[in-house]
Amino acid sequence: EKYYYNNVIGTVNLLRAMLAHGVKKIVFSSTCATYGEPQYTPIDEQHPQNPINPYGRTKLMIEQIFADYERAYGLQHIALRYFNAAGCSADGKIGESHTPETHLIPLVLKAISGERKDIKVFGTDYDTPDGTCIRDYIHVEDLALAHRLAVEKLGSYNGCINLGTGIGTSVKEIITAAEEVSGKKCPT
């Protein structure tokens, strides 16, 4: 329910307020979750969308609402479809902070540092080279830059842009990289 209320109803309320004040431009943080299970990789913007959870469905609904508002009210919009945001800025001012933590990289680092007992690897039978799930990670500073560039493009482009690297990294590869950087073994 929270995704429907926050994402869909919240966006409609925001759009109503924007139109009431003559604002017709928006950059939206969408998600690769609008695609659901990939039919092919790398995933491009024309990939069929079939979200498999409420989060992805509500983000897709918002993209569809933007298209309707473009036709009805001239809304200029860019939806940035994030893949997996990761990392932080060198000064630590921009980055991930989740309570409770659910993202792989921070969980691995917490296990290595001893802040948590271990890291559980769920799924070792994927059709991937090492059997673990593969994700496309994008650094938070790259996301920030993409937002700035999208704001500059508003008016000359309406639509969606994927934000990823196009390079997948497996769960085991993340664990190995963290071990190499830290010089410590990750308890699994």
Segments the model singles out, each with a brief description of its role:
Residues S29, G56, G95, G123, ...:
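Glycine-centered small-residue hotspots that permit tight backbone geometry or close packing
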Residues K2-N13, A20, K24-K25, T34-A79, ...:
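Catalytic helix-loop patch of NAD(P)-dependent Rossmann-fold dehydrogenases
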Residues L107-T188:
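C-terminal substrate-binding subdomain of Rossmann-fold SDR/epimerase-dehydratase oxidoreductases
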Residues T31-T34, G87-A90, Y126, E152, ...:
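Active-site proximal helix/loop that lines the substrate pocket
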Residues M18, E70, A150-L154:
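Hydrophobic pocket-lining residues that define ligand/cofactor binding sites across diverse proteins
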Residues I26-F28, T34, I78-R81, K120, ...:
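Structural signature of the Rossmann-like NAD(P)-dependent dehydrogenase/reductase core
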Residues T11, T31, T58, T132, ...:
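Ser/Thr-centric signal marking residues that sit
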Residues S29, P38, C133:
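A conserved catalytic-core signature of glycosyltransferases
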